[in-house]
């Protein structure tokens, strides 16, 4: 699935507006709309913010997998 469609589907599944997600990413509603509609690219910092906000993996959000794996906090820290 195209990541733009996935972003829109996840946002709508959470009953959130483009303006609300735009605010989360420090963008206007129009700025976020441009990401969902292909007029702007999703920046890696914004992807990380969305993954944490939705508690979903980047692989799922960008459409590399259809498995809605939640983020595993322990895997993001290196064991010493």
Model regions and ranges:
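DNA major-groove recognition helix of helix-turn-helix/homeodomain DNA-binding modules
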Residues: 26, 45-60
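Alpha-helical residues within the helix-turn-helix
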Residues: 12, 23, 52
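Residues that mark the N-terminal boundary/hinge immediately upstream of a DNA-recognition element
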Residues: 6, 17, 43-46, 57
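A short, Lys/Arg-rich alpha-helix, primarily the initiator
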Residues: 1-13
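Short alpha-helical DNA-recognition segment
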Residues: 15-34
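Short, charged recognition helix plus adjacent turn
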Residues: 62-80
